[in-house]
Amino acid sequence: MKKVLALILALCMAFALAVPAYAADDEEVSGPLVLYSSMTEFDLEALETCFNEVYPDVEIEVVSGSVGEYTSRIAAEADNPQGDVTWGGLCDSDGMTHEALFEKWVSIHNDEAMEGYSTPNGFYSMDHLSTVCFCVNTELEEELGLDIRSYEDLLNPALKGKIVISDPNSSSAAWNNLCNIFSVYGVGTDESWDYISKLLENMVVVEKSSVCFNSVYDGEYVVGLTYEDGAIKLNQNGSTTTEVRYPTEGTSAAAYGMAIVKNCPHRAAAEALVNFMTSAEGQTAIAEYEEGTLRLTNANYVVPEGAWLEASADMTWVPRPVNELIERKAELLEHWNELVGQIQG
């Protein structure tokens, strides 16, 4: 990582000199910026480093938390907003759920997004994709004599209490995983609920999405139902005991975005940050910094050589019925909660 840092910073500097301003009306941007985020520390480091090469006078304060935590906070602060912008957690399957919290504004680069990944609602600016995966502790897997590749493999009795997922009521990563199960087995079908019921017999539900890969690395669980950009960073940081695997039945991705808090105190800086993160230049800089551990949305960004994530062309994908999932989200979560109560008490 360190050996490429100088090159990456030089790249960011080059963008600072070569690309047009990202702020509204090309105004000079400086001062504080409060970012509510569910992204990993490394994602935040990448964004802050590359953005500050373009806007060195913006001081970013990060408030970390799940999407449920920070949307509740924004709602509570509505009469006196403290935050400016969000990153992570807000996904295309939210529909208009959070309409009251955010400005009706999207990035100037919205039209540059890959097909299907422009704004879904007029206030999210989509910047990255999060693909459903398993994070597997290969040492524990070997001890159990298993080869975990599919959803059906997760039902093995040897995995009882050894699979972890976060709470889909507050974690977008967990909802993303449920959406993929529904994409494979049918949205709200008897087959899907039968599978989920059996899976809950083996699974532990936790609050924070990062637990679903960090605790697998720590050896607390064998499998985490999680997202690739979080899990792959374990390998990037030297893990030899965890692997990112995609269910053989097929995987799918949710598009995640940024949004500007309604009546935020630092609007110009917020717009500059969103415009930077959704631009081809900004995404290329982020991708270089992160060594290709995040799938991004701008059709023109450059994927770095030797990227950590598996190439999309080599993966098995399943279509995701996004609109149906949006329409039925409340109903599906209600049934999920009922099953959790019945099976796990």
Protein language model annotation of sequence segments:
Residues 112, 130, 195-199, 205-206, ...:
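Periplasmic-binding protein-like
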